[in-house]
Regions:
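Transmembrane beta-strands of outer-membrane beta-barrel proteins
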Residues: 27, 39-45, 73-79, 106, ...
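Outer-membrane beta-barrel transmembrane domain signature
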Residues: 109, 113-200
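Short loop/turn motifs that connect adjacent beta-strands in outer-membrane beta-barrel proteins
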Residues: 20, 34-37, 71, 110-115, ...
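Outer-membrane beta-barrel "beta-signal"
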Residues: 102-105, 208-235
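Residues on the lipid-exposed face of transmembrane beta-strands in outer-membrane beta-barrel proteins
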Residues: 28-32, 62-66, 103-109, 122, ...
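Sequence/structural signature of outer-membrane beta-barrel proteins
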Residues: 45-51, 79-90, 123-128, 162-168, ...
Length: 235
């Protein structure tokens, strides 16, 4: 746990020293395991353009998942996504107020201690005056450091890359990259700090943004031997 705290402080210092470049990206996600097959998930996110300043975005979402087996998982989710203009903390009027519904398939496979997660998602997105479809694919990789599996008292490194595609120009909408470390303290609490680069493509311009991300994951599972978790966000 001490090593995770040191890494967190170092990454915070790096982000603070580049305050104009780094935003903050905070995530709290929870999972309630109802049975061997069914779970309920929810997630809260808060993002800022500067390091814990100029907050411009939040999202609240949740879903229900069904586990076919340890390697195949289906999820139905919905959420509210709100974006504010730049220049302050939650400056009005809103830039975007979105309601979203999505269907998701997650497939896991293992190569010795290396864990791979393939996530496919189809999104239906409703805005005030428009509707859009979007399709996403994420490859997530995790490697436990001090244990063979990711479980209680385990440090790990993790990275993912995700592409966002639409059915309208410019079609390739976004690329999101993450690299970080994590620590699963016990069977219900995981802490994962890391770096995110999000690059957006539009018809007239393309722009990227750096974030310091901190994720806190809470899983409530009454089973004596809970399944090995693949670290990552609902988003």
């Amino acid at each position: 746990m001490r090593a995770c705290v040191i890494v967190l402080l170092l990454m915070s210092q790096i982000a603070f020293s580049q305050k104009s470049d780094f935003g903050s990206w905070n995530v709290i996600n929870t999972k309630l395991v109802l049975s061997e097959r069914w779970s309920v998930l929810n997630e809260l996110q808060l993002r800022s353009q500067s390091f814990y300043d100029n907050h411009y975005y939040y999202e609240i979402k949740g879903g229900v998942s069904y586990s076919v087996n340890k390697n195949f998982l289906f999820l139905l989710g919905t959420g509210k996504y709100v974006t504010y203009p730049d220049g302050g903390n939650f400056v009005k009027p809103l830039s975007s107020d979105e309601f979203r519904f999505w269907q998701q398939l997650t497939m896991n496979h293992f190569l010795e201690r290396l864990k791979f997660e393939h996530r496919y998602r189809a999104e239906q997105r409703w805005f005030k005056d428009s509707y859009r479809n979007r399709f996403r694919y994420r490859l997530n990789v995790a490697l436990p450091i001090n244990n063979k599996k990711i479980g209680p008292k385990t440090f790990y490194v993790a990275s993912f890359d995700e592409i966002f595609l639409t059915n309208k120009a410019p079609y390739f909408e976004r690329n999101r990259f993450f690299a970080g470390v994590g620590y699963q303290a016990n069977k219900w609490l995981t802490i994962q700090p890391g770096y995110v680069n999000q690059y957006d493509y539009k018809n007239d311009v393309a722009q990227g943004k750096h974030f310091f991300q901190l994720t806190i994951g809470i899983e409530i599972d009454a089973h004596k031997d809970p399944k090995e978790k693949m670290p990552g966000n609902v988003d």
